[in-house]
Amino acid sequence: MKKIIIMLSVLATLLFVVSCGSKEAAKPAEGKTEAKASAGALKVGIVYSTGGKGDKSFNDSAFRGLERAQKELGITFSEYEPKDPGAESLNQLRQYAESGEYGLIIAVGFSMKDSLIAVAKEFPEQKFAIIDERVTDMPNVASLNFKEEEGSFLMGAVAAMMSKTNTIGFVGAIEVPLIKKFEAGFIQGAKYVKPDIKEIGIYVGGSNAFGDAAAGKAKAETLIQQKADVIYHAAGGTGLGVFQAAKEKGIYAIGVDSNQDNIAPGVILTSMMKNVDVAVFNLIKEVTGGTFKAQVYEFGIKENGVGATQFEFTKDKIGAENLKKLDEIKAKIVSGEIKVSPTK
């Protein structure tokens, strides 16, 4: 009888284990995806900015940094694309921190500064990073910032070289200091090449300023009506509409954040590369190596943080002489001979 009882007990235990293992795994929350985990790997949580992945710009660049870290450093990650970067981002950052699973939590974009600070104060032992904002005097937050005005100076120089109407345009998402840095550098670079050139800036505004291609196209068409024949954008996914307008109207455009040249080959002269992917990868590498620093990082041309593409589709259009001039301008920015202001 005793043996029978023991056997029944073992059988019951096995049935319980099998039944638990057969249950469907919990699904991630809406907007959240998980990369496959490996034992002992650093886990990174990331909350994207407005527009999310697929913008072929800012967010996609951050994602490339994660992918590289996964491949080269063996990290795993969870990612979240908020529909509302306000309360939704705050909740997701807190959820990551509360889990205790993440060695690093990254907030992509200036709009999450207040949310990140609030959560970082609640979890002082948790490492955080924010892109495109400055958080100081917090021992657990690293800030990754870029000298967009320097890269945009090069874009302005290219625009001035290629403009036949002596009028160039800029489409920004929202009129905030960060986006205005792009326009400021653009103007300075254009006037360095052609002091009398005219620049017209226009901003999209609204709650979907970084993800409204239709609005981007409409704004670009307004600039074209005012004789702008080269248009530079700093508007995330909204810029896709700028490219569409440029292609239809037979003018040039300039991309931003990622290499967007192949979206409309020959129409997009170049793109202002903002190497968010490099910054994200390097920070993750520091964390995996145990050297996380809670400081403000600044990435300019000298630090390979910003710059132009390789003009894959437009070398012949721009010409060797102009490309040589661009290299000279770049060298002067690196040496400090040309100083670029972040404001107009």
Where are these regions (language model features)?
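Hydrophobic helical h-region of N-terminal Sec-dependent signal peptides
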Residues: 6-14
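C-terminal motif of bacterial Sec signal peptides marking the signal peptidase cleavage site
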Residues: 16-19
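A residue-level marker of the well-folded mature domains of exported/periplasmic proteins
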Residues: 22-344
